[in-house]
């Protein structure tokens, strides 16, 4: 590379957590290649499973979020891979989710208030308990519910859990702990590797 990195960035790279996916374009391509060569064949079967999804999912979200590769590059690579004909269902599952990514990004572009306001404005008036102790227990993985706590601790340690488990964390936060979703989303953005806002708390 013809340009040197600033010292501040080099310092941050040295402290990059070892349990996280390795950063950069070369690793983005490695994840794509290993998905198409082997990992992706069980994608459809493992997508919802907390443990198996760590291997069988595309794991492309950090590379897409940080701009290491584009949606188009990922889509074309998977669609044109020789194994596509052997694992069409699984590969099409990933391609569909790449399309969804574009769909939801466009929704945010069209209606950027989604980040801070309820889609259904009626929910803005809904009362929540939003108990600080419950919120803190959820954030630290100490709710007492094994799957919830395991997912939160895994997310904090590795920066990644599958979509279904992320959705489950938010559902528990809102419906079972009776907390306003706005009190939880920032925490998730701080610890998920795909979020450009991520900082080590």
Indicate residue ranges for each PLM-predicted region.
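Alpha-helical scaffolds flanking conserved acidic
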Residues: 89-95, 164-168, 183, 187
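Secondary-structure transition/capping motifs at alpha-helix termini
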Residues: 81-86, 158-161, 179-181
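Single conserved hydrophobic/aromatic residue that forms the stacking wall/gate
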Residues: 191-201
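Active-site core of glycosidic bond-cleaving carbohydrate-active enzymes
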Residues: 97-99, 105-147, 153, 163-167
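Secretory-pathway/luminal and periplasmic proteins that interact with or process carbohydrate-rich
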Residues: 104-109, 177-182, 194
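Contiguous, well-ordered alpha-helical segments that form the cores/surfaces of helical PPI scaffolds
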Residues: 58-61, 133, 137, 146-156, ...
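Acidic/polar loop patches that form or flank catalytic/metal-binding clefts of enzymes
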Residues: 43, 106, 163, 180-185
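Glycine/tryptophan-enriched, flexible segments
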Residues: 1-122
């Amino acid at each position: 590379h013809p340009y040197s990195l600033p010292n501040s960035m080099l310092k941050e790279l040295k402290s990059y957590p070892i349990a996280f996916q390795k950063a950069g374009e070369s690793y983005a391509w490695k994840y794509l290649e290993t998905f198409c060569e082997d990992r992706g064949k069980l994608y459809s079967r493992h997508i919802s499973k907390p443990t198996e999804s760590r291997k069988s999912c595309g794991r492309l979200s950090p590379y897409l979020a940080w701009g290491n590769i584009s949606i188009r590059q990922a889509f074309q690579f998977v669609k044109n891979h020789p194994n596509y004909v052997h694992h069409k269902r699984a590969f099409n599952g990933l391609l569909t989710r790449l399309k969804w990514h574009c769909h939801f990004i466009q929704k945010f572009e069209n209606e950027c208030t989604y980040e801070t306001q309820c889609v259904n404005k009626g929910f803005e008036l809904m009362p929540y308990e939003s108990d600080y102790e419950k919120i803190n227990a959820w954030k630290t993985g100490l709710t007492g519910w094994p799957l919830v706590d395991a997912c939160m601790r895994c997310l904090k340690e590795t920066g990644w859990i599958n979509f279904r488990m992320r959705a489950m964390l938010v559902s528990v936060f809102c419906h079972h702990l009776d907390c306003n979703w706005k009190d939880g989303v920032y925490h998730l953005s701080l610890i998920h590797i795909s979020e450009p806002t991520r900082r080590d708390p």
